[in-house]
């Protein structure tokens, strides 16, 4: 008879005892070496985010074990949705359309609950079409996505999985599922995604900057850069002008991948540093806020560690440019009508190229957070007296980057439709 510890026989022991006991067991297991399980800073940061962990893998590869470890690690505010609970046999989804409908309804219901921060979906998730449905749901409820595949030694070995899977699938059955899981699923882009709290802090700082700039006498003299034609105007509302704003949490893009179709995407995704950093928490430093007639954003100063995740070919406007690596690092805070978010980084490079050429612009005064510089042509830079630090998770954005109806609310009212930028 096993006389080891159990919750039932040791009800007097606090819950935290079992949490520590179970988490300490993950330290020595290679298959559980993920930042979201091992790195305490990441664990703490994820508590401030809405995250959908989508597990992928062949039956018997260790997904369910991994899912339970995640739930056990985060406990409060965490829910697991498992295809097994809906009696879904791994394979083509067509035969289980009603079961998947119920699963998705339950998943969406959890997404709507304010008390749930972390959702874990346990299924094979081997079909692109199915993943795209899940990414759309994540967009709709403003959840960041982390794709997780087991690291067990047998995860792709059909002969071993035949013995391990609970569905008694044959090796041939497993081989049919394998092609969709052998290759990494690349996002639209990789980047650092800010926590909700950090996003709100930075949004507020950006809004105050726009309000102060719009009321500044030096800016009022340059209104023609923002107002078409000869329309007379004494002042303008920059918050409204930059009305095309990112929904949900803010982010700093590292590499645009276009789901693997962009040049260099596959090579970038295969880097060891990326694999080790995926789903890990970072602290980003913001040194300045800027405005141009097209965009407004925050300049990010990357650390040596963060620069390892920065592509080597994105800091140039022309082949002859020689700006330091990481120059383009930024967070888009808003765009003018009909302007795409990619323009924010280009605007920042223009400003930095001008600075490198010896023209830092004219200091025109002090705002609440630092010194204001006029750079000409409607470009303004607020150099922060004290750098801002924001917490973020490094992951991918897997959605379509198109307007989606969003659920949930924030101060100021519900967001009805947003464009992911």
Swiss-Prot record:
UniProt keyword list: Hydrolase, Lipoprotein, Membrane, Methylation, Phosphoprotein, Prenylation, RNA-binding
UniProt KW Transport keyword: no
Short name of one Pfam family: AAA_33
Protein family per UniProt: Belongs to the 2H phosphoesterase superfamily. CNPase family.
The protein's name: 2',3'-cyclic-nucleotide 3'-phosphodiesterase
Residue positions of covalent lipid attachment, annotated as S-farnesyl cysteine: 418
Primary enzyme class: hydrolase
Reactions catalysed according to its record: a nucleoside 2',3'-cyclic phosphate + H2O = a nucleoside 2'-phosphate + H(+)
UniProt GO MF annotations: 2',3'-cyclic-nucleotide 3'-phosphodiesterase activity; RNA binding
One example of a Gene Ontology biological process annotation: cyclic nucleotide catabolic process
GO cellular component, one term: membrane
Top-level division of the source organism's lineage: Eukaryota
Native source species: Pongo abelii (Sumatran orangutan)
Modified residues (Cysteine methyl ester): 418
Chain residues that bind substrate: 253, 332
